[in-house]
């Protein structure tokens, strides 16, 4: 088994999908959490000067959230059973990542650095908030229909097997739902899916014991 180290800030943020994949697979890894105060000295050492970054056996470094997530999903069997399923898992995951990305951008400073705190103005810049809300309106109805189309009577996007797509539905919507608890009231299928992910045999213990962070 390879040795994995996942590098990210001490937040869920863009790394949580990777942590969920490790948890679902029951694979041990080093969850290296970088304090914001340490980041300026480490930034130049990271590929693309960004995190998350996955280190494999101290030989290979993979930056970019979804590149890491796809790699882990393929390695651990959460990427679909054939090429068509894999394509579906990927576009569903990318749709949810669009929501996550637009949400987190509302809490970046003028230099595109995450603040990891909510100011008194909860809404952030009106332009970024508008973009985020448009992304929700564009994606959530489509995902609700997609879930009904593909699940084939099963519990998840690809039937009876949980994939990266289901985990992305859970983690990408965590912060938005914390801010707006009624977000999925018009999307009961997505709401029920998130409950099933939360209750998954491997996922439930992880979600209960993980560190509590604001983002």
UniProtKB/Swiss-Prot annotation:
One of its GO terms (biological process) is glutathione metabolic process. Lens. GO terms for molecular function: glutathione transferase activity; structural constituent of eye lens. Keywords: Eye lens protein. The keyword Aminoacyl-tRNA synthetase does not apply. It holds the Pfam family GST_N. Residues 82-215 form the GST C-terminal domain. PROSITE patterns: GST_CTER, GST_NTER. Residues 2-80 form the GST N-terminal domain. Belongs to the GST superfamily. S-crystallins are structural components of squids and octopi eye lens. Contains relatively little if any GST activity. This is S-crystallin 2. It comes from Enteroctopus dofleini.
